[in-house]
A protein has these predicted regions:
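Structured surface interface patches that mediate subunit assembly and partner/cofactor docking
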Residues: 2-24, 31, 38-51, 68-91, ...
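Extended, alpha-helix-rich binding/interface surfaces that flank or overlap catalytic cores
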Residues: 58
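Glycine-rich loop at the start of a catalytic domain that most often binds anionic cofactors/ligands
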Residues: 61-62
Length: 221
């Protein structure tokens, strides 16, 4: 990804991005589903960019997060995640049949995005649910789901193609505003898509080293 904005006015989008919406979740899920659905099934055994998982395992992780966030918004637990576990007692409750291939994974990603979007849209702004990075509202869970889709989607597509794709600018701007309130001032002149990649520890920016530790802030502000 280029270190310089292609459009000198693009940073304005991040300065006044507007709220995160259920349709943003759907748009993000469609972006990733379209990206993974066009690749051969065997390609998903490759490592997903900088993470240690395969592309398939990383996509499953995204699905699992979408399901977990939808369940949090549905159940509104205040002290912990809902007490669910996978068939072997693991934390991950979502597993996609490997024989379903890329097309099946794309369908599940779309379904996970729709499930989270529907739950976010059904709850009032005053609803709250637990997340380890702060008690959050429906918009916060929507933003967290989008970050998982975009950032891990970038990992997956880099693993599948060897090239890290550009992230959607508007979506990146809105989730940065919601989840990363303490960004350095110098990031204000850069495209939000680049800043989101930096904020999640995946690149350097001019004058800013790559982050080795990071977390978002899910609390309501």
């Amino acid at each position: 990804m280029s270190a310089q904005p292609e459009d000198p006015g693009v940073s304005v989008v991040r300065l006044a991005p507007g709220p995160v919406t259920p349709d943003d979740v759907r748009t993000a899920a469609r972006w990733l589903a379209d990206g993974v659905g066009r690749h051969p099934d065997a390609a998903f055994d490759a490592q997903a960019g900088p993470v240690r998982w395969s592309c398939w395992a990383t996509a499953e992780h995204v699905v699992d997060d979408l399901l977990a966030y939808a369940l949090q918004v549905a159940g509104l637990p205040l002290l912990d995640y809902l007490p669910l576990a996978g068939p072997k007692g693991e934390d991950e409750i979502a597993h996609v049949k490997r024989e379903a291939g890329a097309a099946g994974m794309a369908e599940v990603l779309l379904a996970g995005g729709e499930l989270l979007a529907a739950q976010v849209g059904a709850r009032p702004d005053t609803a709250r649910a637990y997340h380890p990075y702060g008690l959050s509202d429906p918009q916060g869970f929507a933003a967290m789901g989008i970050v998982e889709i975009l950032v891990h989607g970038r990992d997956i597509l880099e693993g599948l193609t060897g090239i890290a794709p550009d992230l959607p600018e508007g979506l990146s701007a809105r989730v940065l505003a919601r989840l990363f309130p303490d960004l350095p001032d110098r990031t204000g002149d850069l495209p939000a898509a680049q800043v989101l990649v930096w904020a999640t520890g995946r690149c350097e920016l001019p004058g800013l080293a790559r982050r080795t530790r990071w977390r978002w802030d899910a609390t309501v502000r």
